[in-house]
Amino acid sequence: MHSLSSALAGSTFVLLFLCLLASAQPLTTPNPARALPDALTGGSSIFSCPAASWPPTRIGSPNRPQRPSRELRSILSQISHKRIEASILKLVSFGTRHTLSTQTNATHGIGAARDWIASEFKRYADASDGRLSVDVIGYEQQPDGNRIPFPVRISDVVATLKGTEEPERIYLISGHYDSRVTDVNDYTSFAPGANDDASGVAVSLELARVMSQPHFPRPRATLVFAAVAGEEQGLYGSRFLAETYRNKSANIEGMFTNDIVGSSTADDGTRDPHVVRLFGQGLPPLTVEDQKQRETRLTIGGENDTPARQLSRFVKETAENEHTDMRVSVIYRLDRYLRGGDHRPFLEAGYPAARFTEPHENFAHQHQDVRVETDPKTGRKKQYGDLPEFCDFRYIARVGKVNAAALWSLANSPGMPRNVRVSTRDLSNDSKFFWDPPVGGNEGVGGYEIVWRSTVAPFWTHVLDVGMAREATVDLSKDNVIFGIRARGKNGERGVAVLPFPA
């Protein structure tokens, strides 16, 4: 009995090891165009796991990465690293953008930064033939006994590119324009915040500029480009923005924050210029899913198939190609240890959200007083501070392209199917599914697809087209794989998959 258990355990370990080895996504990729020839050229799927191909099936076909449309390729080609650099340098020029800094000086402090960001968005709006609208929204934050010692105005700058067919379906990106130094409440010292987070604001600005141009078709769904304040003091601006949308019952089907996306170089000098991390949360907060829903999710093994992780899978399928020249390293957790970001308030409001961050971080260039220190042992001098000289502007432009590929694909594909269920009324070796159309109905939907993967595979490996049906039975046991249902547009664009719950 002992030897049999050992053999089974060994076999299980070997299978799991081979699967993880086959599906591993290493962070270090000096040239992803060479490291990922299949994904970037449309060959065999990178989302497969050869060691996890059991159970065998003859139905469906391999799930392939989604290729960018002609319009998307044109958009990606116009994202400019020089404009991104100019935006970051301008934001740094305000001296400090600390949330508690002056809001009345025209050239210094967070108020000047806010007004400049709004003026840039408005300049793009003026050139957009009425497509882009700009709002500055905010509220008075009272002292919190911690990082807000006195009342302060928190302002978010929001540019909206309204969709043509489904304007009520929204996708949003943000960066935070406030900055800080070592002392989180020091609002007078020079706080350049080039990487954290002028880089993310520059991405929002550049995508708004490019996507709102009149010669591009407007997206089917609405895109929002935001710059928020108060992140360093407690995610205040993002929380206000998320609550504003939630109070309007807005249908936000995806949100991304770009926070610290300015450099590809680690503190030891390691460079990884073609990788960006994407953090996707597992179990939603209990304020979003109640205890019964959570217990059901855990019972069916759906903890890795939350809306945030489905959104992250979509990004990987749409944003890894030769036009972005990037690999998306999906990290299955909310955020880094001891850190937080502006996607969290959106998750807490019930919206799918994820965070983009550079592959390696140099903490000498984050949350630091600008200074030079000499190592007493080596005599070498070390520069501290979040200065623009440590930014890689071409890298930031590539991160912008990843965002653009995801946003444009999301906005031009159908929304997520609703009420996705799998029948559990009887014991059966097949799987029967039911679903309702997306919130916007079947307008623009060209069909539905059932996707699946091994329970140990990170990404969808198989797909089956079932046409316009709203129920389908698959000759594959729901006990052995993870399923999802997604809509496909008449334009061929595939949407985000949804995990079926028992019915």
Curated annotation (Swiss-Prot):
Family the entry assigns: Belongs to the peptidase M28 family. M28B subfamily.
Database matches in CDD domains: FN3, M28_like
Positions of the Fibronectin type-III domain: 416-503
PANTHER family noted in UniProt: METALLOPEPTIDASE M28 FAMILY MEMBER, PEPTIDASE M28 DOMAIN-CONTAINING PROTEIN
Domain of life, source organism: Eukaryota
Protein name per the record: Probable zinc metalloprotease UREG_01421
Cofactor(s) of this protein: Zn(2+)
Taxonomic classification: Eukaryota, Fungi, Dikarya, Ascomycota, Pezizomycotina
Binding site for Zn(2+) 1: H176, D196, D259
Classification via PROSITE patterns: FN3
Binding site for Zn(2+) 2: D196, E232
Gene Ontology cellular component list: extracellular region
Cofactor notes: Binds 2 Zn(2+) ions per subunit.
Keyword match Iron-sulfur: no
Signal peptide: 1-24
